[in-house]
Amino acid sequence: MSLYEKLNNYLSEAETWIAANITGTETLAAISADNEDMTRPLLCRIAVCHALLFAIPSLDLVLTPNGFGIVNNQNIVPASKERVERLIATIEKQRDDTIILLLEKLRKKAQWVDSDAGRYWAETLFPNIDVCERMGIKEHLWDGYQRLRPQIIAIETLIANGFISPELMHDLHDYQFGDMCNSLSADAKSAWAYLLTRLQSEVLYQLGGQPPRQQYLADLVNFIRNNIGLFQQWAESDTAKLYTPPVFVNKKEAQGYFF
């Protein structure tokens, strides 16, 4: 049995994994059917790497100077456990690096952006697994992202409710995807990019175990208020009311009335 035949089931499982976690079924089918699509080679690489991650432990497989070899004769001996683990780590890194490239390109595909898969990646200020590298995580990026994502969402929710507003936070998520950014004026793009970068910095700061920087966040609120024409989502939100208390009126019928 050839190596391809041995890998065939693993490749099918890899495609299912890609559809469930990255592309969605329709986008995967569309890319697979278009030989000219620039993302197709990336998908193929991810599928092969993901398949090998699960196949290598169950195959008599080693990496030789001429490529992969199947241990089935006296000329090739099985690799040590340490070498196999290094091989798996290398392939996993190749897969994760390719996922980063693929997600960058998918953000330009309207079909994907509007899909359930695209919306999953648009739920935070970090729509890619490379956030792990910004946190100093150098390996197992996919797994690392799955651990970080709930923490990111929790931090962003607190920032949204207390400072930025859920409405503006939602649109900042969408800002990173295609059409919305293109529809903004030059001044708006600059302001939104500034706010996005500063918020990402705060989320990363808190992910590192630090408490919220209250003054830092208050300064961002002041930035929004000073550019309120560019952030109408915030102006119309309940969060904005926290920063615009009602004006005191000295009424005679009130208990605290004074002359």
Where are these regions (language model features)?
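Catalytic-loop motifs flanking and including active-site residues across diverse enzymes
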Residues: A47
